[in-house]
């Protein structure tokens, strides 16, 4: 197993992203699991720096799109143009033709442009003028968004939220972390200190090893019971989808791998439950506090759903 390489990436990213080590670990786990990530928080806490540092540490091709109201779907997927000299049409690649797409402030653009990401996030390909083109492998979308209610923001559709493997916030640094940021960021943003430590091929190999992490039937049952509990809870009008259950499984496998284990334990599932489920479920309230209420319900579900006991032997 090559999980030590994942730790090298984490240590490299921390050169640019100071504090909040758990956020770096969450993103690394999601990358190993092969899913897309949504980072939601207020401006200025390091969302973009975190994403750019990962792209640099993994030495992969990355594009960044600042999602504003005037960004068009063709900017994302690409488009065909006519070449008069060759008397034919050719494809001009869009932003998705990379390994890591940083979709900055994704909830500030139009729903039509947001929808342009749907196919590529799920299928790993784009269709332009009837022709389907695969994106490079590996492919990952790291999207950032400001909290709903901020000026110029709008809700992402549930169908798009469900395509993000996890969603998490960063939060403000504590006093010691903020002191470190001030001392180390008087000039530059720290990204110049980040060096490539793995290749895209090594990342693909690690992802394959994650898929081979063993999952006991009792752990499968635990995931199903958690998912069923979200669907049968009166406080939630939208429970965890089967895609969400699969996301929880993948994140648990990736966490076990990163911790140096070849098997999943219930603690892996419990540790990833909130980040996988909070953006997928919906409470009966439709107010701006919906996500907060849903998180509280999920925490209660986690406490009330018994984890499988370790086997004796």
Residue ranges of each PLM-predicted region?
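Dynamic helix-loop-helix/coil hinge segments at AAA+ ATPase domain boundaries and subdomain interfaces
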Residues: 1-23, 212-214
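Walker A/P-loop
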Residues: 31-68
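Walker B catalytic acidic pair
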Residues: 41, 104-105, 116
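P-loop (Walker A) phosphate-binding loop of NTP-binding proteins
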Residues: 42, 76, 144
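Canonical AAA+ ATPase core
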Residues: 83-88, 109, 113, 121-213, ...
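C-terminal engagement/docking regions of AAA+ P-loop ATPases
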Residues: 232-313
């Amino acid at each position: 197993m090559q999980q030590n390489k994942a730790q090298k990436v984490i240590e490299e990213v921390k050169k640019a992203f100071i504090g909040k080590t758990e956020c770096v670990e969450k993103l690394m786990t999601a990358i190993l699991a092969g899913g897309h990530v949504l980072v939601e928080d207020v401006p200025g806490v390091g969302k973009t720096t975190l994403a750019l540092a990962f792209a640099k540490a993994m030495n992969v091709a990355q594009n960044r799109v600042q999602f504003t109201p005037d960004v068009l779907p063709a900017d994302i997927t690409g488009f065909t143009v006519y070449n008069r000299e060759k008397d034919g049409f050719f494809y001009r690649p869009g932003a998705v033709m990379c390994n890591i797409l940083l979709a900055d402030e994704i909830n500030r653009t139009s729903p039509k442009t947001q929808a342009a990401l749907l196919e590529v996030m799920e299928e790993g390909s784009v269709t332009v003028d009837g022709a389907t083109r695969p994106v490079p492998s590996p492919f990952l979308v790291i999207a950032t968004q400001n909290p709903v209610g901020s000026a110029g923001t709008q809700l992402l559709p549930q169908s798009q939220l469900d395509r993000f493997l996890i969603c998490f916030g960063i939060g403000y640094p504590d006093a010691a972390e903020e002191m470190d940021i001030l001392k180390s960021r008087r000039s530059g943003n720290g990204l110049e200190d980040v060096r490539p430590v793995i290749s895209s091929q090594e990342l693909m190999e690690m992802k394959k090893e994650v898929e081979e992490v063993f999952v006991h039937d009792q752990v499968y049952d635990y995931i199903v019971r958690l998912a069923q509990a979200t669907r049968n809870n009166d406080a939630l009008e939208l429970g965890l989808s089967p895609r969400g259950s699969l996301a929880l499984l993948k994140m648990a496998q990736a966490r076990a791998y990163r911790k140096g284990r070849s098997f999943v334990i219930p603690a892996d599932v419990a540790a990833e439950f909130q980040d996988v489920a909070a953006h997928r479920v919906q409470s009966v309230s439709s107010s701006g506090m919906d996500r907060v209420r849903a998180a509280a319900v999920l925490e209660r579900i986690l406490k009330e759903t018994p984890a499988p006991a370790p086997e004796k032997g």
